[in-house]
Design a protein with these regions (language model features):
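Cleavable N-terminal export/targeting peptides
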Residues: 1-21
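Long amphipathic alpha-helical scaffold regions
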Residues: 76-84, 142-144
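Extracytoplasmic loops and strand-loop junctions of Gram-negative outer membrane beta-barrel proteins
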Residues: 91-95
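Membrane-embedded beta-strand positions of outer-membrane beta-barrel proteins
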Residues: 22-26, 52-56, 77-81, 109, ...
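Residue-level signature of outer-membrane beta-barrel architecture
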Residues: 46-48, 72-74, 111-115, 142
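Outer-membrane beta-barrel initiation region
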Residues: 17-48, 85-87, 107-110
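Solvent-exposed loop/turn segments connecting transmembrane beta-strands
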Residues: 29-40, 56-67, 73, 85-89, ...
C-alpha cells in the first residue's frame, strides 16, 4: 500500500511543476447523520492547472485518507473523480461501516465561492456510496 501511494505521489509531483491550487480541508456534515461519524476532517490538497488532484484528510471513521484523482473545472464548479484510502471496514457498536477495500472510488461536486483575503471557500458535495452517507464539506483554497 505504501508503495502504491509513493508511486502515485512521485508520478503526481514529477509531471507537474507549475502553478497549482492548494487547499485546506476543514470539516463536513454527513446526511443522514450517525453518532459514529467524525465531522472534523482536517487535511490538505493540491490541484494542478491540468486538473490532477492529490490530498489527505482525517476521515469519517477517524482514519487518515489519501486520495488521488482528476478535477474538471467549469467556471466556479468542479467535478472530481478518483480513488481514496482509509475506508476499510470498521466495526462500531456491533455495526460494520466502510467499503471493504483498500482503494475505494470517490467523486465530489464542488463550488468555489469568491475569494476572501486571498482564499476562496470551497463547498463540496460527496454523494453517498454503498453504506457511506453523503457529505457536505467545507474547504478553503488558494491559487498560485
Amino acid at each position: 500500500m505504501k508503495g502504491l501511494i509513493g508511486l502515485a505521489l512521485s508520478a503526481f509531483l514529477g509531471c507537474q511543476a507549475h502553478a497549482a491550487t492548494f487547499g485546506l480541508h476543514l470539516g463536513g456534515v454527513h446526511f443522514p447523520s450517525a453518532t459514529y461519524q467524525n465531522n472534523m476532517n482536517p487535511g490538505m490538497y493540491v490541484r494542478t492547472d491540468d486538473g490532477l488532484t492529490l490530498g489527505a484528510y482525517y476521515n469519517t471513521l477517524k482514519r487518515v485518507s489519501i486520495y488521488a484523482g482528476y478535477t474538471y473545472e467549469f467556471g466556479p464548479f468542479g467535478l472530481m473523480g478518483g480513488v481514496i484510502t482509509g475506508y476499510k471496514p470498521k466495526i462500531i457498536d456491533g455495526v460494520t461501516y466502510g467499503q471493504g477495500k483498500t482503494l475505494t472510488p470517490i467523486a465530489a461536486l464542488s463550488l468555489r465561492l469568491p475569494q476572501f483575503y486571498g482564499f476562496a471557500p470551497m463547498l463540496m458535495l460527496v454523494p453517498p456510496f454503498k453504506s457511506s452517507p453523503a457529505v457536505f464539506h467545507l474547504a478553503f483554497e488558494h491559487r498560485f
